[in-house]
Amino acid sequence: MAHKKAGGSSRNGRDSESKRLGVKKFGGENVIAGNIIVRQRGTKWHPGANVGLGKDHTIFALTAGNVDFRKKANGRVYVSVMPKAEAAE
């Protein structure tokens, strides 16, 4: 026979789903137009040349090229896409 009454269930045991934020394409990586470079909350990284900023602060490529992260004098990190040099015709 049981000498202890059954314990209640724990009040813990819940967690939210991860949001998969962060850098998706790193410096020097090749991207095409539309590729997501960074997913973020707020602007930890700021948009530079040839990138767009989505309403959820996602930074994405507007042109094909290589990703470039630059820290400027104001302390902000800017993400740009450097277009590839076109082949001479």
From Swiss-Prot:
Annotated stretches, region: Disordered: 1-22
Superkingdom classification of source: Bacteria
GO MF annotations, alphabetized: structural constituent of ribosome
Any one Gene Ontology cellular component term annotated for this protein: cytosolic large ribosomal subunit
Keyword terms: Ribonucleoprotein, Ribosomal protein
GO biological process, one term: translation
InterPro entries: Ribosomal_bL27, Ribosomal_bL27_CS
Keyword Ribosomal protein: yes
PANTHER family assigned to the protein according to its UniProt record, in alphabetical order: LARGE RIBOSOMAL SUBUNIT PROTEIN BL27M, RIBOSOMAL PROTEIN L27
Similarity field: Belongs to the bacterial ribosomal protein bL27 family.
Protein name: Large ribosomal subunit protein bL27
Species of provenance: Sinorhizobium medicae (strain WSM419) (Ensifer medicae)
Gene that specifies this protein: rpmA
